UniProtKB/Swiss-Prot annotation:
One of its GO terms (biological process) is translation. The keyword Cytoplasm does not apply. Binds to the 23S rRNA. The keyword Transferase does not apply. The gene is rplI. This is Large ribosomal subunit protein bL9. GO terms for cellular component: ribonucleoprotein complex; ribosome. GO terms for molecular function: rRNA binding; structural constituent of ribosome. Pfam families: Ribosomal_L9_C (PF03948), Ribosomal_L9_N (PF01281). InterPro entries: Ribosomal_bL9, Ribosomal_bL9/RNase_H1_N, Ribosomal_bL9_bac/chp, Ribosomal_bL9_C, Ribosomal_bL9_C_sf, Ribosomal_bL9_N, Ribosomal_bL9_N_sf. Keywords: Ribonucleoprotein, Ribosomal protein, RNA-binding, rRNA-binding.
Amino acid sequence: MKLILTADVDHLGSVGDTVEVKDGYGRNFLLPHGLAIVASRGAQRQADEIRRARETKAMRDREHANEIKVAIEALGSVSLPMKTVADSGKLFGSVTAGDVVAAIKKAGGPNLDKRIVRLPKTHIKAVGTHPVSVHLHPEVDVVVLLDVVAAR
């Protein structure tokens, strides 16, 4: 039985692939669960259009992520003044992803979602310059130098 997949199926293929499967597997599992449709010329044309639209969207997303990367890199180092600093230079608490996003926005950078900020494994708990990664796209990452200073 020839089918066109409408969803990613493990060990079989991804969306838009035309696959040959046993009749029982197609009739009893793939078709009832909406994971595939019967292959025909019209269905193949529709699958090709969906694949082209998905590729175009992926390319636009990658270009948009590259534009944001250039804007963030243009900022250089981003300063983050912290109010709660001990005399020894240690912070009472630590820097959060929300703090990083606010510092980038305040420095004139783009508005980012705090979930894409990747802080180092060890928490930032001291004054100084720290590298912070921002995951914009599966293929685009940018490193921001975060300069944590004591607010006066």
